[in-house]
Regions:
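Short, charge-dense linear interaction motifs
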Residues: 1-244
Length: 244
């Protein structure tokens, strides 16, 4: 066909035009996506815990389970009375169910056979206290010798500290982090001779609560220190702005 070269040339020209349009559009979109500023703001607060929990455990041994239980019940009363004498309210004290364990002595005879001999029962019970009187519970946890001196086999755990107004504190930190991020973005835009456009995206990090001036590591899911009465909380906000 005589018109074949003309048709081929026309198709080729059309392909060049289409390619130019596609590439031009892609370049424009790429520039639009890159014409943004991403900044991260930080909000921090230091605070003092207003709630404390503390627990301990006491136990009795006996070959007779009833005897061990009666002795444990007497210990429980002594502990409860002592705590009340220290100003602890009855509704702040919780006793767990009694744990019962059979104890055995193990030995090996001359022929290498293992033997077990019943060595009695061990009954134990856990006591837990939750209170807003932080200093008072701290003092009790440090003076468990008062309980031990009454002939009770008692072991104490370290207190744990919490903050009941954490939700409100978190809102304040989010506001501070957002303000910090926006100020950073405005400074970057100004220094580059641009204007800060609309907010495209905001991402909030997890709250991290550590002891002040500690070397505790942040974790992906958030850190929550319960061993320090004084705490420092932090949260990050990542903002992405369009640049005009």
């Amino acid at each position: 066909m005589k018109n074949t070269p003309v048709i081929i040339a026309s198709i080729a020209s059309l392909g060049i035009v289409i390619s130019s349009v596609v590439l031009g559009s892609a370049f424009k979109n790429r520039n639009q996506s890159e014409n943004t500023i991403s900044v991260t703001g930080l909000g921090t607060k230091q605070f003092t815990s207003d709630l404390i929990t503390w627990s301990g455990r006491f136990s009795r041994d006996s070959y007779e389970i009833k005897e061990a239980y009666n002795a444990l019940a007497q210990d429980r009363k002594v502990i409860f009375d002592y705590l009340q004498s220290q100003g602890i309210k009855p509704n702040e004290v919780v006793f767990s169910a009694v744990d019962i364990e059979k104890k055995y002595n193990y030995s090996t005879d001359n022929e290498g056979n293992s033997r077990s001999t019943f060595a009695g029962y061990e009954l134990s019970q856990k006591i837990s206290i939750e209170s807003k009187e932080v200093t008072k519970i701290e003092n009790i946890s440090r003076n468990i010798t008062e309980i031990i001196n009454k002939g009770i086999e008692f072991t104490s755990s370290s207190p744990q500290y919490f903050y009941t107004k954490l939700a409100g504190l978190k809102q304040e930190m989010i506001a501070d982090a957002t303000k910090d991020a926006k100020e950073r973005a405005e400074k970057i835009a100004k220094n580059s001779g641009s204007g800060l456009g609309k907010l495209k995206k905001a991402t909030m990090g997890v709250i991290q609560i550590t002891a002040p001036n500690s070397d505790e590591d942040y974790s992906y899911g958030g850190t929550f220190n319960t061993h320090s009465k004084e705490k420092e909380a932090s949260i990050t906000i990542k903002l992405e702005y369009q640049v005009d």
